[in-house]
């Protein structure tokens, strides 16, 4: 039960941060910039958390709060999928392709960069 509380606390904070991204990041043309940014930032943070907890074991509860709760609530695959559906339905095929390719590619790179940064900082 305690684990659920940690996930819920992290999730609440992640959802609040995501809300502020959507409130303050403007949409650029047809590109869903806020969704793109929250997913890249969450990927970087998750990579950092992975690297940090490999370098120093800070406890499973904190890891649950940060990785599962915060990063899970900050990132949003369902919105990513819906954004792409809307782009495709609107015949914006190139934008949908670029959004998908750059989101997935940069997401993977962000995880790797976050993990590397954490390991360098925490040696």
Curated annotation (Swiss-Prot):
Chief localisation class: membrane
GO annotation, biological process: cellular detoxification of fluoride
Topology term for the membrane: Multi-pass membrane protein
Cell compartment(s), UniProt: Cell inner membrane
Function text: Fluoride-specific ion channel. Important for reducing fluoride concentration in the cell, thus reducing its toxicity.
Description of activity control: Na(+) is not transported, but it plays an essential structural role and its presence is essential for fluoride channel function.
Name of the protein in question: Fluoride-specific ion channel FluC
Keyword match Metal-binding: yes
InterPro entries linked: FluC (IPR003691)
Keywords of this entry: Cell inner membrane, Cell membrane, Ion channel, Ion transport, Membrane, Metal-binding, Sodium, Transmembrane, Transmembrane helix, Transport
Chemical reaction(s) catalysed: fluoride(in) = fluoride(out)
Record flagged with keyword Cell membrane: yes
Gene: fluC
Record-stated family: Belongs to the fluoride channel Fluc/FEX (TC 1.A.43) family.
Molecular function terms, GO-annotated: fluoride channel activity; metal ion binding
Binding site for Na(+): 72, 75
Transmembrane annotation, as ranges: 5-25, 33-53, 62-82, 94-114
GO cellular component: plasma membrane
